[in-house]
Swiss-Prot record:
Signal peptide: 1-19
Gene: Defa13
Membrane-traversing stretches: none
Tissue: Paneth cells of the small bowel.
Protein name per the record: Alpha-defensin 13
Lineage, top ranks: Eukaryota, Metazoa, Chordata, Craniata, Vertebrata
Amino acid sequence: MKTLVLLSALVLLAFQVQADPIQNTDEETKTEEQPGEEDQAVSVSFGDPEGTSLQEESLRDLVCYCRKRGCKRREHMNGTCRRGHLMYTLCCR
């Protein structure tokens, strides 16, 4: 059950990342890397305010990053992110 909830949240996260508004053409055609562009944090929370069994420490806060060059230590790949026409790796811990 917990796995199903986690996978559902990741699918919703992927849809949300793809639903970002389209940026101006000038911004999309830039090829130089901007400071902080590689790491974009996303936080996902499970459960309701009253608390449920799903609010364990391991599921309470899932932090994901869209990275250009692969996942860092203690992170695992959960798919891909797309921002404009660029593809990134979705890394979560």
